[in-house]
């Protein structure tokens, strides 16, 4: 059985980029009585199962995936975790 590594990519809008989904969630939370929420930023988490054994090369490959497809690096930032 081949070894696999799991990668988790957290993608968020960069600071200063308008987050309309986050604002909608913040407004809805206020409507529901959660008045202590000052800001909401919404993002996404992408999980990948990789047929790889070397953590460093797996992370480099996932970062390349982010740069080419998984994140819009003009307006989004990302963080990669390898487990």
Feature roles, as predicted:
Residues 1-83:
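Long, contiguous binding/interaction regions
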């Amino acid at each position: 059985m081949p070894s696999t590594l799991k990668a988790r990519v957290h993608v968020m809008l960069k600071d200063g980029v308008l987050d309309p989904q986050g604002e909608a969630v913040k407004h809805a939370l206020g409507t529901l009585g959660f008045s202590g929420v000052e800001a909401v930023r919404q993002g996404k988490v992408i999980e990948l199962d990789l047929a790889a054994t070397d953590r460093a090369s797996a992370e480099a490959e996932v970062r390349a995936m982010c740069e080419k497809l998984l994140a819009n690096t003009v307006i989004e930032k990302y963080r990669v975790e390898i487990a």
